């Protein structure tokens, strides 16, 4: 059994594009579920080449800069619905670190191709090209729709033969059709993949909504009989959005004031003020805020209520049926021309609330109009809350609402402060 080494690909660094970064240790091929017989030959391709510029790649095995990527949601959805494609005698697997992916980081992994050639039979297979897809899927009430995708195409055609080191003759060769595998072997293709910063909100699970991410590898193969086949392997991956100090600024004071005059020509007799030191929180944290109010009005006010409101805004795809609505052919025609606004469904829920009773309920109290009462309030954010913005598909916004309420009028005077909730991965 012979181990061949192919040092022909590339790496890159996010911090300094001129700095070469070595790949993590390559996994033992026999740790993989696709174990070959002892007579099988192992060909390993290793990446340790400097990439001066991401779009100006110098090595021979590289993602093609001008290659078409899978921009269509229909293409990505087909990959999601057919996550595994098997060919006779050919299997593919992906090995990557068993950790969460962080937006903006550099991912190192290996794609393993296991080829079992028939004994005493002149067979072989050409590996022409490989697609590496990273995509996100929105699952809502049984419907699935891609919300993010990026793809890189790797070509095996016209590789430099000088970069291929073989200590044993002719188990693999390179031609204008790609990499030719003649007998049983296992090939490893290490890759370096930059996880984009704009990947969306990250992995998310709730009772009705899921945001899931997948990494998929699709290899295009051509056998000696010229039949083109594909083999694919897809694995789910947990994704975390990037947290930067300049983005997650903790101190950002906000103050809002509203008043309610007795008559339109009089001074304000009732005022409500809300102060908070932050507008950005993590799930599970406590929102600290201060309520200041004065009340000398003819209306009776019994208490002050504070609520954490969660608003879902859906923009359904015309091919799906979110909310039981689907555009007909005429509506789709007008929508494609820009004459029809996209259907929108909004739903608001209360995720947390608190109530404080007011001692001075009416104008007949001795409370002076200029005297302010202060309440130091808190509301705990549930662990599952997170702000989500999927552009034209889905938005989840959060608002802190503080209002005066009475028996027959729940909102006499209200203040709403928009807040952002990030998911805590601690």
Swiss-Prot record:
A GO term for molecular function: ubiquitin protein ligase binding
GO BP: any one term: meiotic cell cycle
Domain of life: Eukaryota
A GO term from the CC aspect: plasma membrane
Pfam families recorded: Arrestin_C (PF02752)
Keywords: Cytoplasm, Meiosis, Nucleus
Subcellular location: Cytoplasm; Nucleus
Physiological role: Has a role in meiosis.
Family recorded in the similarity comment: Belongs to the arrestin family.
Descriptive protein name: Meiotically up-regulated gene 170 protein
């Amino acid at each position: 059994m012979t181990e061949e080494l192919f040092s022909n690909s590339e790496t890159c660094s996010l911090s300094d594009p001129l700095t070469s970064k070595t790949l993590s240790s390559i996994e033992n091929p026999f740790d993989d579920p696709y174990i070959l017989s002892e007579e099988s030959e192992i060909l390993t391709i290793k990446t340790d080449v400097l990439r001066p510029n991401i779009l100006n790649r110098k090595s021979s095995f590289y993602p093609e800069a001008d290659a078409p990527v899978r921009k269509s949601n229909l293409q990505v959805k087909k990959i999601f619905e057919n996550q595994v494609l098997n060919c006779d005698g050919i299997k593919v697997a992906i090995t990557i670190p068993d950790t969460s992916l962080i937006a903006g980081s550099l991912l190192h992994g290996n794609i393993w191709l296991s080829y079992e050639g028939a004994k005493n039979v002149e067979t072989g297979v050409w590996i022409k090209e490989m697609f590496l897809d990273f995509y996100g899927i929105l699952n809502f009430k049984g419907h699935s729709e891609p919300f993010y995708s990026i793809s890189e195409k790797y070509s095996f055609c016209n590789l430099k033969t000088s970069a291929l080191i073989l200590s044993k003759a002719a188990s693999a060769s390179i031609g204008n059709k790609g990499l030719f595998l003649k007998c049983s072997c296992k090939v490893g293709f290490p890759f370096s993949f930059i996880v984009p910063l704009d990947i969306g909100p990250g992995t998310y699970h709730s009772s009705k909504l899921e945001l899931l991410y997948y990494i998929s590898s699709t290899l295009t193969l051509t056998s000696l009989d010229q039949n083109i086949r594909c083999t694919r392997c897809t694995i789910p991956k947990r994704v975390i959005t990037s947290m930067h100090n300049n983005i997650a600024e903790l101190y950002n004071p906000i103050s809002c004031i509203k008043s309610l005059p007795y008559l339109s020509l009089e001074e304000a007799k009732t005022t409500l003020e809300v102060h908070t030191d932050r507008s950005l929180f993590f799930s599970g944290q406590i929102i600290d805020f201060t309520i200041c109010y004065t009340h000398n009005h003819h209306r009776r006010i019994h208490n002050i209520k504070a609520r954490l409101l969660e608003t879902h805004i859906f923009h359904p795809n015309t091919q799906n049926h979110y909310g039981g609505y689907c555009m007909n052919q005429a509506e789709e025609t007008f929508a494609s021309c820009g004459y029809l606004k996209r259907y929108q469904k909004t739903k608001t829920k209360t995720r947390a609330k608190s109530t404080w009773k007011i001692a001075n309920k009416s104008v007949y109290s001795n409370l002076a109009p200029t005297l302010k009462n202060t309440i130091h309030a808190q509301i705990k954010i549930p662990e599952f809350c997170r702000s989500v913005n999927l552009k034209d598909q889905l938005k989840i916004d959060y608002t802190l609402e503080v209002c005066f309420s009475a028996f027959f009028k729940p909102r006499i005077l209200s203040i709403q402060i928009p807040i952002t909730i990030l998911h805590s991965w601690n």
